[in-house]
Amino acid sequence: MYPLARRILFALDAEKAHHFTLDALYTVYKLGLIPVTDNRTKPVKLMGMDLPNPVGLAAGLDKNGEYIDALGALGFGFIEIGTVTPNPQPGNPQPRLFRVPEHQGIINRMGFNNHGIDTMIRNIEKSKFSGVLGINIGKNAVTPIENAADDYLICLEKAYAHASYITVNISSPNTKNLRALQGGDELSALLEALKNKQAQLASVHGKYVPLAVKIAPDLDEAQIEDIAHVVKSVEMDGIIATNTTIDKSSLGSHPLAGEQGGLSGLPVHEKSNRVLKLLADHIDGKLPIIGVGGIMEGEDSADKIRLGATAVQVYSGLIYKGPALVKECLKALAR
């Protein structure tokens, strides 16, 4: 059924199709037409949390937490929403989302378009979802990079009571200078500030909410080693590898190869796996890794687990394969 739907959706503007698909999914969910499936197919522990299975939804699909219940019916072991910022912002000008079907890729330069953390919290409070929910946090575009920690701290404080875990997004290529936060001193200062705030919030709320950090695929081994050292030193709870790539050389002479933004899907597969493997080598099992990037079929998820990931996340693969990808991944991981 999805291949037919995809042909129709791919005839639409990519961003319009994105919203149409989510609205349609929500309608089908409200009508009770999504079959109830047991997602407890391969329980795993991640950052102290019990997941029913290790296949999660990556951040970016549901930026405001408007579709949590419907997405929760698709069999995921966990769902991550966002990226969310302290204040609402429109993101970058349209068009800002492009499909590259010849390469099973997607280019986006969305720019953290979202309705703000307060709206997201209200959406979560209305949700009936009782599974593992991650909230991915970022900084507003107007916030100077030297004040970025302030934005992350605001989001952390507001999200804390409503999240199963929180992801610190410092790797989107679509917010100016954001990736500079992945470097040594800047990374240490930011993560230490967040870990200190986490300790305070754990005391206030009487519960511990794990903190993960999401990194880019465009890192050399020295940078990966540096990041591994920092996350171990500050005792982060997890790390997500990886975000989208700014390297579009894999697209060759394709007309969209010159578009600004991050490239995801099949073209990021090898880069993401390279970072995952190097990261796993340098982490030494001190904290779990969530593998994301280029999972287009079930066996791709199994590859990431073999390379050192504890769990995986999908997004672009869903656009090309539909919800069947989740079952395909679970089947591959069960072998």
From Swiss-Prot:
GO terms for biological process: 'de novo' pyrimidine nucleobase biosynthetic process; 'de novo' UMP biosynthetic process; pyrimidine ribonucleotide biosynthetic process. Gene3D superfamilies: Aldolase class I. Substrate binds at residues 63, 108-112, 169, 174, 243-244. It is a peripheral membrane protein. Binds 1 FMN per subunit. Belongs to the dihydroorotate dehydrogenase family. Type 2 subfamily. This is Dihydroorotate dehydrogenase (quinone). It comes from Neisseria meningitidis serogroup B (strain ATCC BAA-335 / MC58).
